[in-house]
UniProtKB/Swiss-Prot annotation:
InterPro entries, per database record: NADH_UbQ_OxRdtase_chain4L/K, NUOK/Mnh_C1-like
Swiss-Prot/TrEMBL keywords: Chloroplast, Membrane, NAD, NADP, Plastid, Plastoquinone, Quinone, Thylakoid, Translocase, Transmembrane, Transmembrane helix, Transport
Enzyme Commission number(s) of this protein: 7.1.1.-
Annotated protein name in UniProt: NAD(P)H-quinone oxidoreductase subunit 4L, chloroplastic
Biological processes per GO annotation: ATP synthesis coupled electron transport; photosynthesis, light reaction
GO MF annotation terms: oxidoreductase activity, acting on NAD(P)H, quinone or similar compound as acceptor; quinone binding
Species classification: Eukaryota, Viridiplantae, Streptophyta, Embryophyta, Tracheophyta
Physiological role: NDH shuttles electrons from NAD(P)H:plastoquinone, via FMN and iron-sulfur (Fe-S) centers, to quinones in the photosynthetic chain and possibly in a chloroplast respiratory chain. The immediate electron acceptor for the enzyme in this species is believed to be plastoquinone. Couples the redox reaction to proton translocation, and thus conserves the redox energy in a proton gradient.
Gene this protein is translated from: ndhE
Predominant localisation class: plastid
Length: 101
């Protein structure tokens, strides 16, 4: 596959994630957009690793590290959101002022 096509795809995914993160008012949607951003970064790591030196696995190892961080975020994020929902009865970002109490 051509490098430019993959980079355009990654930039498109990253832009969608940033747009969704900025405009979302729901915490669940913000977490999903954050996952989209992390996946765009993974695509870049693997693409540049394959394009510049396919014998070394630096980009692939970084990608596995980012996937592990995303898995931890996917496990801890909903637990925090359910706790916030239990206490505040809402998952809206603009309604939750957690530093108030």
């Amino acid at each position: 596959m051509i490098l430019e096509h993959v980079l355009v795809l990654s930039a498109y995914l990253f832009s969608i994630g940033i747009y969704g993160l900025i405009t979302s008012r729901n915490m669940v949607r913000a977490l999903m957009c954050l996952e989209l951003i992390l996946n765009a970064v993974n695509i870049n790591f693997v693409t540049f690793s394959d394009f510049f030196d396919s014998r070394q696995l630096r980009g692939d190892i970084f990608s596995i590290f980012v996937i592990a961080i995303a898995a931890a975020e996917a496990a801890i994020g909903p637990a925090i959101l359910s706790s916030i929902f239990r206490n505040r009865k809402s998952t809206r970002i603009n309604q939750s002022n957690l530093l108030n109490k």
